[in-house]
Amino acid sequence: MVNFTVDQIRAIMDKKSNIRNMSVIAHVDHGKSTLTDSLVSKAGIIASARAGETRFTDTRKDEQERCITIKSTAISMYYELTENDLAFIKQCKDGSGFLINLIDSPGHVDFSSEVTAALRVTDGALVVVDCVSGVCVQTETVLRQAIAERIKPVLMMNKMDRALLELQLEPEELYQTFQRIVENVNVIISTYGEDEGGPMGNIMIDPVIGTVGFGSGLHGWAFTLKQFAEMYVAKFASKGEAQLSPADRCKKVEDMMKKLWGDRYFDPAGGKFTKTANGPDGKKYPRTFAQLILDPIFKVFDAIMNFKKEETAKLIEKLDIKLDTEDKDKEGKPLLKAVMRRWLPAGEALLQMITIHLPSPVTAQKYRCELLYEGPGDDEAAMGIKNCDPKGPLMMYISKMVPTTDKGRFYAFGRVFSGVVSTGLKVRIMGPNYTPGKKEDLYLKPIQRTILMMGRYVEPIEDVPCGNIVGLVGVDQFLVKTGTITTFDQAHNMRVMKFSVSPVVRVAVEAKNPADLPKLVEGLKRLAKSDPMVQCIIEESGEHIIAGAGELHLEICLKDLEEDHACIPLKKSDPVVSYRETVSAESDQMCLSKSPNKHNRLYMKARPFPDGLAEDIDKGDVSSRQELKTRARYLADKYEWEVTEARKIWCFGPDGTGPNMLVDVTKGVQYLNEIKDSVVAGFQWATKEGALCEENMRAVRFDIHDVTLHTDAIHRGGGQIIPTARRVLYACQLTAEPRLMEPIYLVEIQCPEQVVGGIYGVLNRKRGHVFEESQVMGTPMFVVKAYLPVNESFGFTADLRSNTGGQAFPQCVFDHWQILPGDPKDAASKPCQIVADTRKRKGLKEGIPALDNFLDKL
């Protein structure tokens, strides 16, 4: 079944209960791409001999060179289960052939937006953890995202070869290591997931059920408890039991699996399982997992790595491993690889785990629909998604754009949730800003071609039914990054993805040769398409700004821009950080502004948010879409707001969703509602560009205390009210002790203990502070967690490596905003310097504008 044709894949696509859409997620360098190779080779796409070295899914040249995954890549594989294995599947199934759509995603935190895009189109995730270093910060971030999207995880403990060969652990220690990782992962799942009564049921991972795999991607071997349970069931079976039916056999194997993990012990003399650790004569029994599973593996490793020829031959015969003739002459590591691959093939174990335990689209879309679809839960589109109905209206989500070999064109990459997408079908293409009933951000166009994504290749295909992952040609001109494609007139959008990091680092770019400007603009447009996270902004001064998640992310983006998208030489500025403006006290006076015609007056004050509220708005716990009373209740209970005020929040800003509020605390003002729209517009404008240096505001609450208006409607139109509202908001900000906020990274550094001192030195120089330091159990490694201002993080990795002899590995991820100490109005302070630089860069007037510009006297 090596080169299966498109027609064969197409035939399985209709069996939607036999499709598995899954992504591989993990911390950077825990071996995702290497592990994916075992799966790909099992499905017969690359030669099994090279699996583990090819990294088939790293398609770009820079990915191969740097040995990191940068873009997520999709690949479709076919896998057939035997009769016996089919019995283990608890959901509905249709035949024994399975189509597995696998997406290999990057582990590096700067590319976590790629992971988000991958998660949206899949239903299950294979979480890979390096069993030596355990659960790291990125594992947690990504797993948290997966659970928020209601994606079912299964776990793979990778790099067991390191645990055996480098650390030389005892079987019992290794068991404890595994047990600890399983517990850590389950803690994360239970913290962020819904409880067992939720729509997904119990999603905790448990080796006993078979949702945990162990193995080594590099050597190409892996197993779950199921594989060993099957061996032992066959071994202990008496002669008459050989003809068991698959269902009975399945039950026996499942019973056996329960005995192979946890506090179960094996009495080798009597050949019995017991639950007590000590026998009657006081001698300790070995744990079943150590004795029956790890011990054989240890024996194989020991015999081969110590070149014990006779023992090796005996073991190979006993384990019934058939080696090729060329493998028989190998010794040492090459022989070890060959033997382990034959005995416990990784592809087999993992593909079984995926098909048995991950949900099919039919199962998953039932509980994912409410999270995916913005519209009502009972319209045609929602019903189509819930039932994964090929006869329903087409509903498809595009999660990212993939550049084609043809410069400047993109494949739209996404998943069909309901209906069928086919070549030449006329569809509605809806961007993220589309609202039902309006015409903006909506195009009616035919799809030119539908294609199948296969890692480095694409295959044309006639049509694709729901539950599958697909690429579209000819849609890229109408969407920027993501969007919904549908044939249903009243369809709402699919929800926009929430990214776990935000673009806080910016670089200004310009063309070296001014004549190339049009190419640069075109290139920036393409760059914005090709990366789910990056933002391209044009400042008023005419500068082109690129914003990304971190240094590495920006470096890759700029390289892409220069080589692929714009194809011109560029000049780049040093990286700059975006700041936020805020206030630190209540306004010291009531601020008044009069409208240009002197007939209307607005009175307002500003004050800071209580701690934690801005973060709640970012997370979406408090939002403009909530029901009034629930929101008021939440604010009253958690932040002790007055309920009357909490009910009269006019809006959030900037962009209607940001972490600032406009609250109406007036009593009985005439015509107030008629100017609401104008004041809100002024508020959105002011919070987007604050008074200090035109950066976004954050965590400011503006209270409208009183309004006097002209009785005549013509004298209080938008032209009178909007600029007035903006001026009074600026006055409020400047009278309430304005401050700047800077973004802070959470840095996790793994290092041996002898270099911890060097790390403290680097962090102190860069205004960082350590808030946690712990030792990884059973290893000489320390984990240091610290907060580091993004502004100081440039060159941090290089600095750290040079001070620790290259032994420390940092991971930076954006964590929170923090107020910069010092008053921006005081000429000697650091914030004042930053404000001056920013204003100069943006081409604004020097110095913070005087209060008199905004404040009027009665």
Curated annotation (Swiss-Prot):
EC number: 3.6.5.-
Protein name as it appears in the record: Elongation factor 2b
Principal location class: cytoplasm
Entry function: Catalyzes the GTP-dependent ribosomal translocation step during translation elongation. During this step, the ribosome changes from the pre-translocational (PRE) to the post-translocational (POST) state as the newly formed A-site-bound peptidyl-tRNA and P-site-bound deacylated tRNA move to the P and E sites, respectively. Catalyzes the coordinated movement of the two tRNA molecules, the mRNA and conformational changes in the ribosome.
Gene3D superfamilies: 3.30.230.10, 3.30.70.240, Elongation Factor G (Translational Gtpase), domain 3, P-loop containing nucleotide triphosphate hydrolases, Translation factors
Domain of life of the source: Eukaryota
MF GO annotations: GTP binding; GTPase activity; ribosome binding; translation elongation factor activity
Subunit structure: Binds to 80S ribosomes. Actively translating ribosomes show mutually exclusive binding of eIF5a (EIF5A or EIF5A2) and EEF2/eEF2. Interacts with serbp1; interaction sequesters eef2/eEF2 at the A-site of the ribosome, thereby blocking the interaction sites of the mRNA-tRNA complex, promoting ribosome stabilization and hibernation. Interacts with habp4; interaction takes place at the A-site of hibernating ribosomes and promotes ribosome stabilization.
SUPFAM superfamilies linked: EF-G C-terminal domain-like, P-loop containing nucleoside triphosphate hydrolases, Ribosomal protein S5 domain 2-like, Translation proteins
Similarity annotation: Belongs to the TRAFAC class translation factor GTPase superfamily. Classic translation factor GTPase family. EF-G/EF-2 subfamily.
Native species: Danio rerio
PANTHER family: ELONGATION FACTOR 2B-RELATED (PTHR42908:SF29), TRANSLATION ELONGATION FACTOR-RELATED (PTHR42908)
Enzyme class: hydrolase
A GO CC term assigned to this protein in UniProt: ribonucleoprotein complex
Location in or out of the cell: Cytoplasm; Nucleus
Pfam families: EFG_C, EFG_III, EFG_IV, GTP_EFTU, GTP_EFTU_D2
Family annotation (NCBIfam families): small_GTP (TIGR00231)
Keywords on record: Cytoplasm, Elongation factor, GTP-binding, Hydrolase, Nucleotide-binding, Nucleus, Protein biosynthesis
Catalytic activity field: GTP + H2O = GDP + phosphate + H(+)
Positions carrying Diphthamide: 715
Positions bound to GTP: 26-33, 158-161, 216-218
Keyword Cytoplasm: yes
Domain tr-type G residue range list: 17-362
CDD domains membership: aeEF2_snRNP_like_IV, eEF2_snRNP_like_C, EF2, EF2_snRNP_III, EF2_snRNP_like_II
Any one GO biological process: cellular response to xenobiotic stimulus
